[in-house]
Amino acid sequence: MVSLGGLARKIFGSSNERRVRALQPRAEQIGALEKEMQALSDEALRGKTDEFRKKLADGADLDDLLVPAFAVVREAARRVLGLRPFDVQLIGGMVLHQGAIAEMKTGEGKTLVATLPVYLNALTGKGVHVVTVNDYLARRDAEWMGRVYGFLGLTTGVIVHGLSDEERRAAYACDVTYATNNELGFDYLRDNMKYERAQMVQRGHAYAIVDEVDSILVDEARTPLIISGPLDDRSELYNTIDTFILKLEPADYEVDEKQRTATFTEEGTEKVENLLREANLFKGDSLYDVENVAIVHHLNNALKAHRLFQRDKDYIVRNDEVIIIDEFTGRMMPGRRYSDGLHQALEAKEHVKIQPENQTLASITFQNYFRMYGKLAGMTGTASTEAEEFGNIYGLDVVEIPTNLPVSRIDEDDEVYRTVEEKYRAIVREIKEAREKGQPILVGTTSIEKSEYLAERLRKDGLKDFEILNARHHEREAYIVSQAGKPGAITIATNMAGRGTDIQLGGNADMRIHQELGDMPAGPERDAKEKAIREDVQRLKEKALAAGGLYVLATERHESRRIDNQLRGRSGRQGDPGRSKFFLSLQDDLMRIFGSDRMDGMLQKLGLKEDEAIVHPWINKALEKAQKKVEARNFDIRKNLLKYDDVMNDQRKVVFEQRIELMDGENLSETVAEMRQDVIDDLVERHIPANAYAEQWDAKGLKEGVLQYLNLDLPIDEWVKEEGIAEDDIRERITEAANKAAAERAERFGPDIMTYVEKSIVLQTLDHLWREHLVNLDHLRSVIGFRGYAQRDPLNEYKSEAFELFQAMLGNLRQAVTAQLMRVELVREAAEAPPPPAPPAMQAHHLDATTGEDEFANGDTMTLARADARIVPAEQRDPNDPSTWGKVGRNEACPCGSGKKYKHCHGTFA
């Protein structure tokens, strides 16, 4: 019986079909302009760009220009690339222009589709970012599609790893910029650590098209981009704790693979306490006393490293380094490190050099970075399974674009075996059969370990001619993928390694020409060889087609249906024939974790013999149900993490906007004066409470506070003895003295140097305190979950306490800036020119090796204003005049004669 919803869909079509149908008339209008565009000369076609820009300047809307602009790009692509976008590609381009996700199957020409909305939106002059997953694709697409933009008078830039700031600035200044998601995010963070607006490289976030949008906005959504600086060396502690884990028995801990957690049992806790006592690392009466918080953190990391993280699956060891493997793509991520000491725990486990732990200087998630764009769009072959997440988090609709030719791939039911060994025997048999008839085979695995195990099995069975595509060999992955469609080719790939490069039946002629002919000079000989290669590729294509097209053979189901669909989608591109099949066993991770016991019992009742498989649509449905559960759980995790990250993101936006205002400000004297007044008001309120009697006033505390923060030794203890004096009188006297001292200093420095000094100190102090604040938020986040046990909502508690921490940070900023500006002095050879610009924040700060404190945090910030800072001998320092002290070390005795260290006396401003 057909449901009412099903009946309505039959009559009216689905919402997706209606949306595509609504765009069809515009595709026809673009088609109607084709002959007119073909009649134009190259120069006249290029002249359309200036014509469109003039119309925009005169008040036209981008939507008004869509039809003629798309027609121009279609003709330019035909002339420059020999490629003419189909009508379905025009529709895909319209969807991207509308700020939605275009789901287009593999081989449907997503790279070409992007040129249509990119050109249209680049006409505004605000810049368009095209985001790819790796440097290879960014370079390839910028070079390839840049020919179309260049033909039409637009500039194209590309951002890849290793570029200088000047090169990045030039690339972002282009009309169209191709870049990886990582480079974009890191450039944004680095820009917000610069000290001059002119040093920044990005120029705004107007419009971005994200290629492989599911990979970037879903799979990597939980991974924050972090810029960090090293803390002190704790390698000995990591190694010691690692030895403890090796002494534990299985009864000492519990591992939940589903939740990815590992915890100590009571027996384990007792054993660990004894080990810590022996190593003199235990404090208090219990492991979970507050004194042991840091040790517990290290223990938990070491347990996770040994019981949840597997070598060659989650990471590999290369050149004495632990390198993370992306769980979704199987690619290595050199330079990426797990945070909070987990990476150091893995290094201790693998007995490689332990790198220093890092302190976060700046961080952002892809979720929050990409939500900054005024308009965001995306392309992928598989987005519909995550449509709810795209809608809820990014406000993006998913629109399935029809294929140009019908998909003729056959997706066969899964074959399920009882054991892994039986499954692998069946896989080897299947590969041999397909190879014998000349069918190209892509074998999908879930980890490097499994891909290499299968490779070894094939070698033992006499199959030696195959390629492995995984994180160990990703340098060659584009070429390997491009030739995986040759008849009888066997390619073993982890997850979606090689995404972004089509598998063409018979191989890719252009890549073969590039590989085989390289830099061979143009001429008759090269032409003849190119022709021979193209003819050979065509012959091989016909042979592969006759054998049934590409066979995608998957060795396991992934947690996400989307990853499975991506793997299937490698076959059957542009109407080619193909087939796909999954080979599973009850011992596979997904089956084992999500309840295969019942299924095992059923298969035994059915009398399933060794090497026999069960093939039934019911199995597929059961697995899909398990995958939906995992997807829903992962979505909930990401959604929940985003709620917490939004708290930090709101604060980040305030701080980063404030930095830009400070950098742009010509004169900060008003801002600095307000900060100084706030500090005075706070001191008076703290030491002279409202409505308190004079004898209750803390004159001594106020005097010390004024000396500490304002560098003024005022007779406050005498003032309070005066008859009828009120708190407002004291406030006014302090304010008058402070303003006078500040004005004298400004006059001595001159306006140029004073402006530079104020800007430098405010910016560097803000950066320092923001970094400390990030650490405090991390600590708060790690413990806030326990509030749930007290029947309080952890998120609300986090919001409330994070706000209090932020307010405290702003208070500390006012105090630190005031204290430093009231002490800063110049020791210089020439006063004519201001000092050179301060170095970038990442290099400007040095952490004290013994205390872990930042050298510039307090007194040393004053050296920013010095063209030639010097250390003054003790006998030349006047204890009552800090201007004679010169550079004072943080751990030196304070020159004022208090007997305290400088950092605990006049150096305690921050």
Curated annotation (Swiss-Prot):
Mainly localized where? membrane
Which coenzymes or cofactors are required?
Zn(2+)
Q: Where does Zn(2+) bind?
A: 894, 896, 905-906
Quick one: a GO cellular component term? cytosol
What's a Pfam family this protein contains?
SecA_SW
Entry keywords, A to Z:
ATP-binding, Cell inner membrane, Cell membrane, Cytoplasm, Membrane, Metal-binding, Nucleotide-binding, Protein transport, Translocase, Translocation, Transport, Zinc
The answer to whether UniProt assigns keyword Transcription to this entry is: no
GO:BP terms for this protein?
intracellular protein transmembrane transport; protein import; protein targeting; protein transport by the Sec complex
InterPro entries in the cross-refs: Helicase_ATP-bd, Helicase_C-like, P-loop_NTPase, SEC_C_motif, SecA, SecA_CS, SecA_DEAD, SecA_motor_DEAD
Q: Where in the cell is it found?
A: Cell inner membrane; Cytoplasm
Membrane topology type, per the record?
Answer: Peripheral membrane protein
Reactions catalysed: ATP + H2O + cellular proteinSide 1 = ADP + phosphate + cellular proteinSide 2
| UniProt xrefs under SUPFAM superfamilies | Helical scaffold and wing domains of SecA (SSF81886), P-loop containing nucleoside triphosphate hydrolases (SSF52540), Pre-protein crosslinking domain of SecA (SSF81767)
Give the EC number.
7.4.2.8
User: Which residues are listed for ATP binding in this entry?
Assistant: 89, 107-111, 502
Q: What GO molecular functions are on record for this protein?
A: ATP binding; metal ion binding; protein-exporting ATPase activity
Q: Where is the signal peptide?
A: none
Recite the UniProt cofactor note for this protein: May bind 1 zinc ion per subunit.
Q: How does it assemble?
A: Monomer and homodimer. Part of the essential Sec protein translocation apparatus which comprises SecA, SecYEG and auxiliary proteins SecDF-YajC and YidC.
* Role, per record: Part of the Sec protein translocase complex. Interacts with the SecYEG preprotein conducting channel. Has a central role in coupling the hydrolysis of ATP to the transfer of proteins into and across the cell membrane, serving both as a receptor for the preprotein-SecB complex and as an ATP-driven molecular motor driving the stepwise translocation of polypeptide chains across the membrane.
What family does this chain come from, according to its entry? Belongs to the SecA family.
User: What HAMAP family does this protein's entry cite?
Assistant: SecA
What name appears for this protein in its UniProt entry?
Protein translocase subunit SecA
Organism this protein belongs to: Chelativorans sp. (strain BNC1)
